[in-house]
Amino acid sequence: MIIYVLYAVLGLILYLFVIKPLTEMIKLKFQFGKDCKISFTFFGREIFDQLKEAKESKNTRDIFNKQKTAYNKYQYKFFVTNMLWIIRISIADPSYQKEALLNHDQYQKVDPVCHNDLLSKGLVWSKGEQWKKQRKLLSSSFEFDALKKKVPMINEITQSKIEKFSNENVLSSLQSITGLIVIKSFFGIQTDQIYINNSELQVEIANIMNEMAYMRFKSQIQSTKRLIFGTKAWKIFPTKEEKRLLQRVKDMRSIVGDLVQQRIKYFEDSNNSKINTINENFLNILVNEYLKITNKQQQEATFDQIIQEFITLQFAGTDTTAVLLYHCLYFLACYPQAQEEIRVEVNRCCPSSFINENEINNLKRLSAFISEVLRLKNPAMRPIIRVATQDHKIKDLQIKKGWLVCIDYFLQNQSERHFENAGQFDYTRWLQDNPIKDDNNFIYIPFSAGPRNCIGSQMALLEAKIILGQILKQYQITRNGNVEVSWEIHFNHQLSPTNAVILNKIK
């Protein structure tokens, strides 16, 4: 009897982990032929092989190198592999990418930190009517006329912060700048003295998210645990590191909750006329909506949503922009001639200490430089992985419910089909009239595209130009010859270590 039970269990394992995923892969291979590359792995070792390769190579280290090499060799439309029984399909063809991005309601974004109390209710990961409501509430704050009013504040923060710039941790210094800009401009909190675990609040939020997201790459056991148990994985045989991270999350949420509660009390103590005329930053908008709710249970859920929205927007506005700036500084250090050309432009177009909104439009070379960095080393190199919520088709590609879908537009950014000398860094390509070949408007999409594109793209570019302009006015940027660099995945795709460049004051 026992032997038959064992046979049944082994048969089930064989079906789930081998026959089921392999059958789907073979069907796709038969349908698309050479346009579909497949790689069956029993425990989804593909990603871990990439990590191993990234660690063992030298200064060209990049977690995506293997995928870029495979794409350039085979020119496939889809790359299909598996994580246990789950199919993961990476879409490389821009026409299929376009369809997937336009039909976003057929997917749910996968939360890289896999934790219910941090990002799941924020704008980036919410879905359906909740997402539409959040996007509508917040969209006016990202319109260009509203952003222009923030230019003096961005200059002031940048100038005060770069005076204390640390070459020991350049990325952290940049996070301090971008995070304070977000806190003051979008949450109306007029202080940079909120500390937690010996770090500024904005830096601690970024550190927590990056460390939690990176946990999934620490070992195959960690990744498999998340895949099977989802958000409950943090409480199943937690390691010491996981316990420490969970405590930091609790401490951080407590501080954010206090900030939200203070704003609620301020509104409650204010008369209606004052509420109507108060500056409409994100926190005020969200709290105003909260105060319209009379049901206590719904109020508690909304309070938690405000905390998560705060964390989501604070992190998105802090880390991604800071990592982009860090990448720009690295390429400026690698290409000193380009650095000098752009510095000359900044000093010519922006002669005063502040860089104003009218001058920003004249910084053509700086804009082109940022575009080239985004083409080659975008912090959001691969958009957030999506899981299909229903069976559907992308053109003639059948996607089944539960499949993981990756939209790998970074492959097109470095393809000779669309860019001359695609593997070379050449910011001057963006000074030409038509830098992109065979463009369907979904080739170069550094901030994604479609209805769920990055709501903060204009803000990120505005910040990047002002902060880089201010740094170029005051500092010479060189590479740190004492470190070896690599391009890793934490939450974003980012340069490591955090002191790969050195800023020297211009005398």
Specify the residue positions occupied by each region the protein language model found:
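Conserved cytochrome P450 catalytic core segment spanning the I/J/K helices
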Residues: 143, 244-324, 363, 431
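Cytochrome P450 catalytic-domain helical core, especially the substrate-recognition surface
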Residues: 38-65, 87, 112-187, 200-265, ...
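Cytochrome P450 catalytic-core helices
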Residues: 320-337, 343-345, 458-473
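Cytochrome P450 I-helix active-site segment
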Residues: 34-40, 151, 155, 200-212, ...
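Conserved cytochrome P450 K-helix E-x-x-R motif and the immediately C-terminal K′/meander segment
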Residues: 52-75, 254, 258, 353-396, ...
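Cytochrome P450 proximal C-terminal region
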Residues: 6, 71, 158, 347-349, ...
